[in-house]
Amino acid sequence: MVKMLVLYYSAYGHMEQMAKAAAEGAREGGAEITLKRVPELVPEEVAKASHYKIDQEAPIATPGELADYDAIIIGTATRYGMMASQMKNFLDQTGGLWAKGALINKVGSVMVSTATQYGGAELALISTQWQMQHHGMIIVPLSYAYREQMGNDVVRGGAPYGMTTTADGDGSRQPSAQELDGARFQGRRVAEITAKLHG
């Protein structure tokens, strides 16, 4: 059975919802799932004052455990068109894994959330994939296999590189049913492709 980690950073809970949906989809695809988050770097008093969602139930991951999985889906909030510093800080601690080639031929996939539709989602998706590529991971994108990302009738998440959601500047917009469905699709797709590669 494929062992998959869904690893995320979420300040306000949007990516937490997407990560849970991706985990559901991966389970449907036959994977054994672990859902974890990266440590918060913002001081607790600042996080509380900024109304961060600090009661997230997922346990905190450690960089060394990434080698234990066949596939890793990273979900991250974005800051100025890049992954959030919390996720970058976590990935910057994986140099030991890189030196050992511990993630070579593992499967990787990425999802992001942004404040606006044009808030750098595609750049954040691709630049997070770069981190995985430096580790020798095999990238499995959302791709246009997920057809529900097409159309302009409503705000829709998704890009060929990975699933996206938009939160609005004040965080008031929650992931839509379509976006959660896309996250489930991506999780299932990663699980099924990983099973073919590692089965």
UniProtKB/Swiss-Prot annotation:
Region of interest called Disordered, as start-end residue ranges on this chain: 162-181
Broad class of enzyme this protein falls into: oxidoreductase
Boundaries of every Flavodoxin-like domain copy: 4-190
A single cellular component GO annotation: membrane
Its EC number(s): 1.6.5.2
Keywords: Flavoprotein, FMN, NAD, NADP, Nucleotide-binding, Oxidoreductase
A GO MF term: NADH:ubiquinone reductase (non-electrogenic) activity
Positions with a binding annotation for NAD(+): Y12
Amino-acid positions noted as binding substrate in the UniProt annotation, renumbered to this chain: W98
Record note on cofactor: Binds 1 FMN per monomer.
Cofactor: FMN
Annotated positions binding FMN: 10-15, 78-80, 113-119, 134
Highest taxon in the source lineage: Bacteria
Reactions listed under catalytic activity: a quinone + NADH + H(+) = a quinol + NAD(+); a quinone + NADPH + H(+) = a quinol + NADP(+)
UniProt cross-references to InterPro entries, sorted A to Z: Flavodoxin/NO_synth (IPR008254), Flavoprotein-like_sf (IPR029039), Flavoprotein_WrbA-like (IPR010089), FMN_Rdtase-like_dom (IPR005025), NQO (IPR037513)
Compositionally biased intervals (Polar residues): 163-177
Keyword Zinc: no
Entry similarity comment: Belongs to the WrbA family.
Protein name, per record: NAD(P)H dehydrogenase (quinone)
